[in-house]
C-alpha cells in the first residue's frame, strides 16, 4: 500500500506541475485576460443565435440558425446534444481557463502514453513537453483552432489504450481506449480523428505481422477485438454528432457538387468530395519540410518579427524612415519564400527531439518502431500534396473519406505525435545503456550535422534564390531597395537557424558524452537534455506567440464593433437578410448583428455557396431579391452605409408558374432568363410532377409571416384557389416539417435553394418546424452505448470474482 501511495503521489505531483506550467505559460490569463482567437471571433458571429436561443429558452438547444448563409444546421457550430457522457469527462479538464487547459491536455495525455510504453516517469515528462510544445500545437491554439487542438490532445490517450491492450492490460486498456477514442471524436474535428485512424491502422498492421511471426495471433486477436469494441462504443457515445454531421455533409461543400459545368461553361471535374485544388491548396513544399527541424529554412511564417536589432531595421532608419515606422515594419516582415498561400508559423518539432527520434529509428526493432517510422514517412509524403501528385492523387481518388478534408499539410500532425514517441524511446535507451549506444548515437548526429553544414555551403555558392512567389507584389509596394533587404533578411534567418541547429546537436552530443564518461549523473543528464529541448522548442514557439492577443473579457464578449449602419438596420423589426459584399462568404461580422447571407465556416451549405458564386459571376441582383436581402452594407467615406433593396421579395410570395428542368445546371441557366417574382424552377429529382399550379390564379391571394423563431416559422394564408407559395428560406429536408393547419404536408426545393409549398384554397395557417429526428435517434444510441460500457466494466471488475465463487 505504501508503494502504491508513493507511486500515485509521484504522478499526481507531475500532473499538478503540468497544470501549473500550463497556467504560467499563458500568464496573461492570470490577470483575467482572455485570448482573442481569430477563428473564435468568427465563431462568435456564427453562433450568435445559438447563444441567444439558449439564454431565452432555459438553455434549450436549437439545431438551426438563420443568421448565416441564409440558414443552416448547427451540427458543426458547437451544438450540444443530450446524453453527453464524454462531455462530463472533458469538462473535468476545463477547470483551467482556455487555452491553458488544452496545453495541460497535451502534456497529460502524452504523459499517460509514455508511461504505457513503458519508460521511466522522468523520461515521460521529457516526452510530454517534446509533444506539447511543438510549434504547430501552440499556434493552432493562438488562432483559435480549438476543436483541432482538443482532438490532437486526445490522440496520445487513444494510442495508449491500444498499447495497453496489446500488452494484455485488459481493463486499463479498455477504459483508456474508450475514453481516448471517444474524447478525440467528441472534439468534433473529424479530420484529426481520421489521421489518428492512420496511426492505429499501421500499429495494428505491424503488430499483426509480429504476432503472426511469433505465433501469438490468439492474444493479438483478443487485443484487437477488445480495441474494436472500444472503438464501436466510442462511436456510439458520439452517435448524435456523428450521425448529424454525416447527414449534413451530403448538403455541404464537403460533398461533391451536382453541377456538371463550371461558371464559365466548361466541364466540371466530378468528385464526391472537395475540389482537388481546394484540398491541395496548402501543400508543404518538399524542401520546406526541413522546417520541421530548421524553422526558418524557408523564412519561417508569412510575417516574421525581426526586431529592432535586425539589419533591416538599421537600413530603414538610415533611409530616413522614423524609428517607430521601422519597428512596425520589422515586426511583420514577409520573409516566407515557400509556396503555401499563408503560413502562421513553421511546424517545428525540435531538432533535439528529432535527433533522439532518428537515433531510435536506427537502433530499435519491432512493430512499434516500424509503425511509427512508417506513419511519419507517410504523413510527410502526404503533406507534400500537389508537390507529390502520384501519391496524393491515389489517396484522393481511392482512399475512403480522404477527399472530404482540405489542407493536406495538416496531415503532418501524424509525425508530430510519432516523432516524440520515438524520441522518448531513444532517450530512454541512451540513459539506461550509455556504453552500448554511445557510438550508435553519434551516427544520426553526424548525419544531421553534415546536412546542416551542407546547407550552409549550398547557400554560400548561391544554390538558393530566396525569392518568394509574392516578390512582384512586394516590389510594387515597397520598391527594389527594400525588397532586396527583405531577401537579404531571408538569407540571414536561414543561416541563423542552421547555426542554431548545429549548436543544439553539438550540445546534445556533449551532454551524452559527459554522461557516458560519468562526468555527470543520469538525473543531471536528463535535466540538461530537458533544458536544451525546452530552450529549443520554447525559443521557436515564442517567436510566434503574441501575448498582445490576450485582451479584456469585454472584448471577447463583444468581438465586433457595432456601426451606425448596423444600428439603423436593427431598427427594422421585420424579417430580412443583410449582405456585406466586402466580406462575401468569408466573414461572420454581419452574422453577429443580422440575418446574413454571408458567414464563416469550413463546411458551408454547398448549394448556397454555388448560388452565391453564380450570383457573383453573373451579377444578378435578382438572386439577392429572392433571398430577401433588404439591406446591402457598402463601404463609403463615412464607413459602412446601408443601402435599401426595394426589390427584395419578402418572406414568401405566390408564383404564376412552375418551370420544370432536368438538372442543377439547368436551374442556374434558367435563373438568368425568367422573372423570379412570377416563376419558380424545380428539378425533376425534386418531385417536379407533384408541384403544379392551377390555371385560376387568384391575384388577391395573401400570405404573411405572423410568428418566427430560429426553428419555427408561421404564416397566414388566404386565397380563393390553390396556390404555390415560394418561401425565402433555405431548403433542408432532414428536420424541417411543413404543416398546413397542423397537418404535415410535403414541401419542395425550388430556385436551387428555396422552399415551396402547394397550398389549398381558403384561409390557412402554414408552419415550418425544425425537429431533426437524427438527434433523437443518436441520443438513443448514446444511452445504449453508456449502458454497454457500464456492463462491460462490471464484467471486468466482478467477472473473475463471480467465476471463483461458483467453482
Question: Where are the predicted features?
Answer:
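Contiguous transmembrane helix-bundle modules in multi-pass membrane proteins
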Residues: 144-153, 165-182, 190-227, 231, ...
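Transmembrane-helix motifs of polytopic, lipid-linked glycan transferases
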Residues: 101-118, 353-356, 422, 509
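Transmembrane signal-anchor helices characteristic of membrane glycosylation enzymes that use polyprenol
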Residues: 11-48, 230-244, 378-382, 454-456, ...
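Active-site-proximal, structured, solvent-exposed surfaces of multi-pass membrane proteins
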Residues: 630, 678, 682-807
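Membrane-interface coil-to-helix junctions
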Residues: 19-110, 129-152, 267-351, 382-392, ...
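Polar, glycine-rich mid-to-C-terminal structural blocks
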Residues: 222-284
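Extracytoplasmic
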Residues: 257, 261-267, 531, 535-699
